[in-house]
């Protein structure tokens, strides 16, 4: 029986829930636990720390439908998307996971039951093939003896990638760490499609398609390459939703499943395309999925890192829309149809629909302004191309000047059977790439980061001073047993009052003290379940096992608490004033300021800013108790607690409430009552990206300082105007009105002087074949007056060519005017260009009027002297 994609997703989750698995929501496309990843690209990403032993959950079995993006970095499918049956920038990975619970037997039996069970997917058993790692006899025997697959459909795959354990059937997290063999399940579409089984010379065909990969994590790879058995083996599986949907819906291409058919029809509608087989429709249908969900997860178009990948995908989609004949912005119109086809997986996208649409529309409009010019330039270059390769320098110029990603240029070239010199492009990009590498940590070895086996207990909600024991020390990322005075290090304690940076709140500062030593803590960070105190040993020596007294900087923490509580009040106030579309997109809570990024499509009006301030200060005056409760995540959401989308929460969460005004999930530190905040003031509101606004605000003493500073400025101004602050507005208005009157009188005098100068100049014109030529350098004339003078002179002289120049602060300003009856022979733009070139400048304009600037004032006399000969030649 054919199932819809949404039904397949739900059936998978229901099946594993019936087998005792916790259904875990998809994590954000922006990984929050792995700096080595650009985007979430597999179901196991959100559980990586669990597999590494750095995190623990209150369940040992889990199942997910994880949103993934593969575009940029190691997994870059972008150039193939739309041109093959199964490449996507965005896909959903169905997965089931065991954290030291079941292993090979149950994992294989679960997979077989779901795929072939009459009440589940009911696939014909004879169509299923499997592969196992060459030496994994255990998995082989389970498939053969327990499941009953014939030997000829079980294929052993060895180290087929040129190194020990380098195999399609051996999975490794990195050079070190958890790894193990895997078994893959393939579906045979039938002999009407070309291709051979896995491991055969024809394996790249489309007949045998991998639908499920089951990884058995049973080893811990050491730095020397040896494999140590894990004490608790685990299971990580992944099945592409789109692939299994194609199988269950009896189609050979992912783009023919119900989800994509609906999206492709929507793309055709908004672009005006009638050919539903056009590959550009497939490209756009794929790209709207990745782009919409990336924006919903907080990624915005930019020229670096994740934002640049998003920009590349958007621009590729827009360019394909251009190829289909789209005459206006269209891409953002696909968000609505996408939400409809995603079903329950699109709920968060629906909540942010307006924001996502605005970001996509703005980016498309920006690109549309350069797309036409960029394509025209590329067409010119391709038309004069000798050979079949476009040079990298041209590709870079398109990128640098017109914002064309190189893969978009390659797309255009591929349609004409032309290659792009990507090596040349990379050479031209090297400086930017070097800077990007320095600024980004993406691609670092996850396993080389600080890893702490022990956990730290945070007790800073109730204590600012605590005795603890050193459980680990790190210098330059490496574990050490002891440090001496002057050394910088990371100190891990068994328990600590220091808050580690999280949720936008900065880490605590303070001191660790003990017998003969003092360690100054400049920052506090999380390392898995451990809390690291970063700083410098200012005196004595410190070693693992030492007892310490941990003292948090109390005054600094107090200011942070006020700012964090005020952030919650402001978030609630923004949603009241601007609407419930407001969602947090980033925050910083420090001891000096609070910064809050949120979704909103326009600048806030002064009245809205004042209303938010008033609402927050009203809650401060109410002196509400700030209460925290620990409860189940579902119960917290039912209570109305706001959760940050994409943030990882445990099943038991901390709910922070301020009366009936604000309820949020939060692990940060807060004031006891809203009245402790004292005063709240917004000091700035600005835009950070399309659809994202930023507010900076201060509280308590910081807020009072801004009040005093503002009062001092008003008093200073009043003193300058010889008045007092009470009638300051009237005084300023009077001064501005007097200034406007004086400026008007001054302009009248300048106009009179220019008119008189024009009258004097007209007598200096010379006759060239019936055309009056006037060339003059003017002293003491503002550049903006030159245009008025040219208009006056054209009226006085009739058939004429005029060139005027002036020099102000070493900069040359030029203007050329040509009467209409002469423009067929002398064009002002060409004339001014000739003169400007001689004075180190450039310019242009209409045939009858053109302007230019230059930097070489010394060359001006000679440049003006050349005009008569140039004009005379044109008039012959």
UniProtKB/Swiss-Prot annotation:
CDD domains: AlaRS_core. It comes from Salmonella typhi. Belongs to the class-II aminoacyl-tRNA synthetase family. Keywords: Aminoacyl-tRNA synthetase, ATP-binding, Cytoplasm, Ligase, Metal-binding, Nucleotide-binding, Protein biosynthesis, RNA-binding, tRNA-binding, Zinc. Pfam families: DHHA1, tRNA-synt_2c, tRNA_SAD. It is found in: Cytoplasm. One of its GO terms (molecular function) is ATP binding. InterPro entries: aa-tRNA-synth_II/BPL/LPL, Ala-tRNA-lgiase_IIc, Ala-tRNA-ligase_IIc_anticod-bd, Ala-tRNA-synth_IIc_core, Ala-tRNA-synth_IIc_N, Ala-tRNA_ligase, Ala_tRNA_ligase_euk/bac, DHHA1_dom. Its EC number is 6.1.1.7. Binds 1 zinc ion per subunit. Zn(2+) binds at residues 564, 568, 666, 670. HAMAP family: Ala_tRNA_synth_B (MF_00036_B). Catalyzes the attachment of alanine to tRNA(Ala) in a two-step reaction: alanine is first activated by ATP to form Ala-AMP and then transferred to the acceptor end of tRNA(Ala). Also edits incorrectly charged Ser-tRNA(Ala) and Gly-tRNA(Ala) via its editing domain. Homotetramer. This is Alanine--tRNA ligase. The keyword Cytoplasm applies. GO terms for cellular component: cytosol. It catalyses: tRNA(Ala) + L-alanine + ATP = L-alanyl-tRNA(Ala) + AMP + diphosphate. Its cofactor is Zn(2+). Consists of three domains; the N-terminal catalytic domain, the editing domain and the C-terminal C-Ala domain. The editing domain removes incorrectly charged amino acids, while the C-Ala domain, along with tRNA(Ala), serves as a bridge to cooperatively bring together the editing and aminoacylation centers thus stimulating deacylation of misacylated tRNAs. GO terms for biological process: alanyl-tRNA aminoacylation; negative regulation of DNA-templated transcription. It comes from the Bacteria.
């Amino acid at each position: 029986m054919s199932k819809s994609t949404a039904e397949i997703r739900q059936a998978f989750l229901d099946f594993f829930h019936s087998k005792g698995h916790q259904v875990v929501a998809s994590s954000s496309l922006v990984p929050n636990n792995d700096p080595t990843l650009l985007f979430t690209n597999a179901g196991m990403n959100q559980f990586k720390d669990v597999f590494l032993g750095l995190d623990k959950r209150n369940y040992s079995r889990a199942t997910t439908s994880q949103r993934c993006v593969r575009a940029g970095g190691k997994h870059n499918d972008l150039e193939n998307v739309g041109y093959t049956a199964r490449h996507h920038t965005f896909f959903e990975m169905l997965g089931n996971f065991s954290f030291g619970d079941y292993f090979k037997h149950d994992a294989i039996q679960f997979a077989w039951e779901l795929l072939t069970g009459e009440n589940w997917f009911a696939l014909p058993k004879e169509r299923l093939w499997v592969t196992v790692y060459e030496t994994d006899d255990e998995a082989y025997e389970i498939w053969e003896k327990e499941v009953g697959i014939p030997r000829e459909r079980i294929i052993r795959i060895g180290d087929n990638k040129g190194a020990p354990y380098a195999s399609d059937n051996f999975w490794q997290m990195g050079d070190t760490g958890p790894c193990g063999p895997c078994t893959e399940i393939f579906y045979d579409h039938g002999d009407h499609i070309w291709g051979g089984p896995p491991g055969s010379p024809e394996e790249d065909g489309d007949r045998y398609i991998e639908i499920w990969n089951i990884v058995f994590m049973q080893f811990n790879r050491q730095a020397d390459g040896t494999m140590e058995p894990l004490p608790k083996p685990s299971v990580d599986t992944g099945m592409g939703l789109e692939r299994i949907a194609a199988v269950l819906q009896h189609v050979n291409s992912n783009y023919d499943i119900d989800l994509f058919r609906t999206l492709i029809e929507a793309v055709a509608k908004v672009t005006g395309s009638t050919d539903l087989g056009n590959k550009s429709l497939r490209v756009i249908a794929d790209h709207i999925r990745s782009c919409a969900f990336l924006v919903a997860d907080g990624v915005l178009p930019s020229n670096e890192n994740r934002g640049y990948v998003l920009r590349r995908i958007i621009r590729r989609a827009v360019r394909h829309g251009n190829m289909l004949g789209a005459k206006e912005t269209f891409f953002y119109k696909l968000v609505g149809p996408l939400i409809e086809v995603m079903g329950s997986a699109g709920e968060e996208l629906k909540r942010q629909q307006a924001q996502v649409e605005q970001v996509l529309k703005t980016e498309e409009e920006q690109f549309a302004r350069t797309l036409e010019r960029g394509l025209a330039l590329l067409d010119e270059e391709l038309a004069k191309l000798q050979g079949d390769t476009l040079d990298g320098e041209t590709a870079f110029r398109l990128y640098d000047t017109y914002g064309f990603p190189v893969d978009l240029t390659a797309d255009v070239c591929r349609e004409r059977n032309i290659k792009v010199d990507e090596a040349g492009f990379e050479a031209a990009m090297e400086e930017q790439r070097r800077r990007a590498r320095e600024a980004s940590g993406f691609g670092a070895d996850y396993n080389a980061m600080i890893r702490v086996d022990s956990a730290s207990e945070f007790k800073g909600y109730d204590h600012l001073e605590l005795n603890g024991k050193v459980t680990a020390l790190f210098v330059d990322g490496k574990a050490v047993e002891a440090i001496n005075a002057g050394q910088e290090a990371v100190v891990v304690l068994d328990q600590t009052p220091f808050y580690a940076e999280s949720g936008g709140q900065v880490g605590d500062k303070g001191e660790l003290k003990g017998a003969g030593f003092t360690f100054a803590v400049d920052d506090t960070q999380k390392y898995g379940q451990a809390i690291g105190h970063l700083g410098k040993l200012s005196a004595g020596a410190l070693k693992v096992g030492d007892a310490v007294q941990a003292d948090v900087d109390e005054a600094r923490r107090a200011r942070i608490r006020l700012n964090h509580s005020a952030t919650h009040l402001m978030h609630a106030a923004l949603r009241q004033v601007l609407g419930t579309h407001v969602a947090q997109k980033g925050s910083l809570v420090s001891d000096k300021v609070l910064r809050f990024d949120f979704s909103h499509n326009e600048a806030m009006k002064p009245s809205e800013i004042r209303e938010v301030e008033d609402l927050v200060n009203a809650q401060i005056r109410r002196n509400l108790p700030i209460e925290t409760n620990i409860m189940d995540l579902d119960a917290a959401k039912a209570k109305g607690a706001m959760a940050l989308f994409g943030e990882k929460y445990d099943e038991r969460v901390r709910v922070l409430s301020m009366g009936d005004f604000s309820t949020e999930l939060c692990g940060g530190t807060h004031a006891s009552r809203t009245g402790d905040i004292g005063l709240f003031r917004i000091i700035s509101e600005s835009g950070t990206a399309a659809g994202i606004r930023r507010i900076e605000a201060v509280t308590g003493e910081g807020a009072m300082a801004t009040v005093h500073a503002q009062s001092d400025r008003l008093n200073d101004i009043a003193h300058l105007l010889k008045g007092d602050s009470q009638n300051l507005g009237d005084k300023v208005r009077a001064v501005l009105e007097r200034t406007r009157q004086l400026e008007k009188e001054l302009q009248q005098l300048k106009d009179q002087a220019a008119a008189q100068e024009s009258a004097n100049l007209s007598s200096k014109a010379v006759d060239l074949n019936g055309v009056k030529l006037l060339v003059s350098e003017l002293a003491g004339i503002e550049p903006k007056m030159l245009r008025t003078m040219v208009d006056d002179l054209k009226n006085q002289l009739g058939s004429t060519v005029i060139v005027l120049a002036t020099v102000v602060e070493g900069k040359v300003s030029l203007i050329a005017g040509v009467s209409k009856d002469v423009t067929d022979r002398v064009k002002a733009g060409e004339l001014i260009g000739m003169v400007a070139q001689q004075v180190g400048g450039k310019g242009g304009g209409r045939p009858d009027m053109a302007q230019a600037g230059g930097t070489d004032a010394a060359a001006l006399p000679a440049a003006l002297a050349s005009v008569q000969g140039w004009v005379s030649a044109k008039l012959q």
